[in-house]
């Protein structure tokens, strides 16, 4: 097996900067690829959190004028990750998260900020750094969608480029007038280039021009070729269907390991799963819930948005609580949903607890202490929380969409009879069907043996990066050999 070098280009990476599952993927994939003979470095923006978290940064290139200011490339490490950091203070050193300011609005120069990241990635791929020539570029989501565009319109030899869609809903659409400012020629503004509904489509560019497209589950790869999930890009995705594949995400099973997790009160495995009771008690205390060992405790760890279906959860909450269930919710997002769950916590003291925000340690504690994890998403490219839930023995209750459908085995009669069920699915994705799923979950929870089987099946499911990394390694080698 010949050794390959790959450059991943991404707007976030765990553990340095994270707003969602993209960071978990880009943080775990390089390590997972090592056994396959692939050495992956990752190019990320020099946000303050990144610059403050890297080890031994060394300047390897400088730009006198790069998208409006001086910039430099730093080679650095973070734990096992090999990084290249685009240190451009005029673009990345600012408060807020990577995409929005403290006022909750997108940074007005996002088009330039992420064009810069993409252009730097393409340049590195084409030999910018002496002695480093990656065989493959791997770009992620709209923020790096221009990578294959810069390669395609450079007029120079270029490595193959894979583009991964983590969420088609975020598309990076900007006005045509920025074309020259981002360094693309007029000929790029065409239907088979970066043009999208009269503007520049960063995500569309990646889909149009990458050598291969992946998304993060087989079901989502099919869904996005239809009008319900295609978000206006289904026609292009159908045209490129022979270049599109779905590869499930994994999770970092060293970070998510109930046998050695330092963030939870009691560690456990399938032999000592009874220790989860201590975690449940601690979780109830943390969320101000009644100490009720037998109550069905649901956890939610989610962005609070329409996509995630949490408005439906508010609709069915009274019925769920009437059956004696409890809810521990961790998340942030749309103001009406934040207000709705805060109000529910006040209305149902002892039964509903809500922490608005994100807390990595608390996320681990929910997985380790909740009986079930709710993921009622209207669409879900892959989803990672349900994978963590499986690993931790929190039975996932999920909508039958995208990666949720691919990773959770519904507890229907056949699956229970054959001993393979790992959770509860519902479809179609409506409040009425969610309510039915909750009733079914309560019945399963009341049957101690059936519930324990669901937990053990989940905990013995392989949710690691082993299989996904194998698929990516095969894809890279197919591209190079083509």
Curated annotation (Swiss-Prot):
The keyword Transport does not apply. InterPro entries: Glyco_trans_1, GS/SS, Starch_synth_cat_dom. Pathway: Glycan biosynthesis; glycogen biosynthesis. SUPFAM superfamilies: UDP-Glycosyltransferase/glycogen phosphorylase. ADP-alpha-D-glucose binds at residue 18. Transmembrane segments: none annotated. This is Glycogen synthase.
């Amino acid at each position: 097996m010949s050794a390959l070098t790959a450059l991943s280009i991404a707007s976030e990476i765990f553990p340095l900067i994270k707003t969602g599952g993209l960071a978990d993927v880009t943080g775990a994939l390089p390590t997972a690829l090592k056994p396959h003979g692939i050495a992956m470095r990752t190019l990320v923006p020099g946000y303050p959190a990144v610059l403050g978290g890297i080890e031994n940064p060394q300047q390897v290139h400088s730009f006198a004028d790069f998208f409006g200011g001086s910039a430099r490339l730093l080679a650095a490490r973070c734990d096992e990750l090999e990084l290249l950091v685009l240190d451009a203070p005029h673009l990345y050193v600012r408060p807020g998260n990577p995409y929005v300011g403290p006022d909750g609005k997108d940074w007005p120069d996002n088009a330039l900020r992420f064009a810069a990241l993409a252009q730097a990635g393409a340049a590195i791929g084409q030999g910018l750094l002496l002695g480093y020539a990656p065989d493959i570029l791997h770009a992620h989501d709209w923020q790096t969608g221009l990578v294959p565009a810069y390669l395609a319109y450079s007029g120079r030899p270029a490595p193959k480029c894979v583009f991964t869609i983590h969420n088609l809903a975020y598309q990076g659409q900007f006005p045509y007038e920025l074309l020259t400012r981002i360094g693309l020629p007029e000929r790029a503004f065409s239907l088979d280039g970066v043009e999208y509904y009269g503007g520049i489509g960063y995500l569309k560019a990646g889909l149009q021009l990458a050598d291969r497209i992946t998304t993060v589950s087989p079901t989502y790869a099919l869904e996005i070729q239809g009008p319900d999930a295609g978000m206006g890009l289904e026609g292009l995705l159908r045209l490129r269907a022979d270049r599109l594949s779905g590869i499930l995400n994994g999770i970092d099973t060293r970070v998510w390991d109930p046998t050695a997790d330092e963030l939870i009160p009691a560690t456990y495995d399938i032999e000592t799963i009874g220790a989860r009771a201590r975690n449940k008690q601690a979780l109830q205390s943390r969320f101000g819930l009644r100490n009720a060992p037998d109550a069905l405790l649901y956890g939610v760890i989610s962005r609070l948005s329409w996509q995630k279906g949490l408005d439906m959860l508010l609709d069915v909450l009274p019925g769920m609580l009437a059956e004696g269930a409890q809810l521990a919710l961790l998340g942030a997002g749309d103001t009406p949903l934040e207000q709705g769950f805060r109000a529910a916590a006040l209305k149902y003291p002892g039964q509903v607890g809500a922490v608005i925000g994100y807390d990595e340690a608390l996320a681990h504690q929910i997985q380790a202490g909740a009986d079930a994890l709710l993921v009622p998403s209207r669409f879900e490219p892959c989803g990672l929380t349900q994978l963590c839930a499986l690993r931790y023995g929190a039975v996932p209750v999920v909508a039958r969409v995208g990666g949720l459908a691919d990773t959770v085995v519904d507890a229907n009669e056949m699956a229970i009879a054959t001993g393979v069920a790992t959770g509860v699915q519902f479809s179609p994705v409506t409040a009425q069907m969610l309510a039915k799923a909750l009733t079914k979950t309560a019945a399963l929870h009341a049957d101690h043996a059936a519930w324990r089987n669901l937990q053990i099946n989940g905990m013995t499911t392989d949710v690691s990066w082993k299989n996904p990394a194998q698929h990516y390694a095969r894809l890279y080698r197919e591209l190079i050999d083509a």
